Amino acid sequence: MSNYTLKFYIIKSILSKKIPFLILLSFLIGNCSTSKTKQLNSSEYKLLLSSEKFDDPLTGFKNYWKIVKTVAKNHGIKVIEKEQTFDLKHKEISFFDTENLALRKAGFLIRQKVKYKKGQKKPGFEYGVKYRRTDPANALAVDLILHDGYTPKDETIELESDVVYFSRNNGSAETTYSVSNSTLLDEAPEMRLGSFADIYPALGKLGIPETAPLTKVAGVSADEWMVVPGKLDFGDGLFGRVDMTVWIIPTRDGELRIP
């Protein structure tokens, strides 16, 4: 059975108070093993939304969920709503790179996630590495399988496409392809390239010194608030889970918080 994941990301810009909002649609075509697959098994479609729609995240979630349900009804798609429709989940999201962003320039990113429970950070860390390119064959050229002794969070090293639409630019679109792999750790590694190369051998082949320190990109972390209000039934065993997420991060003018 295939799965369809619909995600809504609202991302606050680091550099200004003009906050872009990102709606992300992910289509999971199928499953694969822990080995790398050449099949495109995930596609994400992204649209920019107005920040004014989400001054209050929960209100924005509820209003946008109404829109999703209306559109689904108009297209004959059944909506399966969760009993706890707007149960908020909270995480801290951080990205790490070298001082001169050597990983980004090489097409890589390192992401750290820490979960919260009742306002307190839970023990443990989730680390993910993603490699992105504009051509799927180039994305598949990198092997993100973990070193012996580390266990992947998922059984899949996914090839996915990200499609970003620019409605103000003659409706043009930009597509990138990526592979990614994540693992759960009890302790955070030492923040240098070599520590992560010990987990992801591919990072040790970039020509970046193993001693190169890794720091948070832009020096900030994002507070992520997410709800999973339900899923869509497209028929023939095809279901879509809907995630709606707000990221809140500091800006040049101080930290902006959504009430």
Task: Label the model's feature ranges.
Residues 20-28:
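Bacterial N-terminal signal peptides
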Residues 35-259:
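Phosphate-end processing signature that detects enzymes handling 5′-triphosphorylated RNA
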Residues 6-20:
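Bacterial N-terminal signal peptides that target proteins for export
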